[in-house]
Design a protein with these regions (language model features):
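Alpha-helix boundary/N-cap detector
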Residues: 1-9, 61, 177, 181, ...
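Short N-terminal edge-element motif at the start of the domain
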Residues: 1-24
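Short alpha-helical segments and helix-capping/turn motifs at coil-helix boundaries
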Residues: 14-18, 79-81, 124-127
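N-terminal interaction modules that seed assembly of large macromolecular complexes
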Residues: 16-65
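Short, surface-exposed beta-edge/turn micro-motifs
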Residues: 27-30, 93, 136-139
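Eukaryotic short linear interaction motifs
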Residues: 39-42, 104-105, 149-150
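Short HxH-centered metal-ligating active-site micro-motif
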Residues: 58-114
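Glycine-rich, aromatic-bearing surface loops/beta-hairpins
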Residues: 107-210
Length: 210
């Protein structure tokens, strides 16, 4: 079971990573979350060529396809996946960083207000990026081996500048009744990737060899 100090370390490390970004229009990134010390974690980048992200255009599908591919790769004798750097520490989870557009219900922009109203009524709306007044965000969605879910976001303050707000973090444990409020294709793809690379138990063969 992942203890509270490690959960807090994951939150802090994800927020620090998002805070370190200074440019926009970056390609998405996926990484493992590994325990580097008693109360510390490290993020280890899983390389995905930019051409892969650009060719598909829908990052969650790229992550889901990556999960399906790496699931078939061989493993180390101890059951750990080849993508997990053993020297970085025990695997705790997986994270997925990306950029997205969102609509703020408190926005004064007429186009945003209309889009929010139509969404609440169950109607269709244009793509968020096409709506005048929408907000641009850097995001990290992460999941851990205990079923916990993490969401970290930072909003661009002005379109003409690169500064963003201080990252906001949200953690929902597996037992949290509000856990289902953090769902969607991004969460599903991240879970698939974690399931594809998480450690597998070592099986004894009939001859007594591992």
């Amino acid at each position: 079971m992942i203890q509270k100090p490690i959960v807090q370390a994951i939150e802090q490390t994800l927020a620090a990573h998002l805070r370190s970004r200074t440019e926009w229009d970056e390609p998405p990134v996926v990484f493992t979350i590994q325990q580097s010390g008693p109360d510390s974690v490290v993020l280890v980048h899983i390389p995905v060529p930019r051409v892969v992200w650009d060719a598909h255009g829908h990052p969650p599908t790229v992550v889901a396809n990556l999960a399906a591919t790496v699931h078939q790769l061989p493993r180390h004798p101890d059951g750990t996946h080849l993508l997990v750097h053993q020297r970085a520490g025990k695997l705790l989870g997986v994270g997925f960083r990306y950029e997205a557009y969102t609509l703020a219900a408190s926005s004064d922009a007429p186009a945003v207000q209309e889009a929010v109203r139509r969404r609440k009524a169950g109607g269709s709306v244009p793509r968020f990026r096409e709506i005048v007044g929408r907000r641009e965000e850097r995001c990290i969605t992460a999941v851990d081996l205990d079923g916990g879910r993490y969401m970290v976001t930072a909003t661009r303050i002005e379109q003409a500048k690169s500064e963003a707000t201080e990252p906001r973090t949200k953690y929902l444990a597996f037992s949290d009744p509000k856990r289902d409020t953090l769902t969607g294709n991004v969460v599903d793809a991240t879970i698939r990737l974690l399931n594809a690379i998480k450690p597998l138990p070592i099986r004894d063969d009939p001859g007594g060899h591992r």
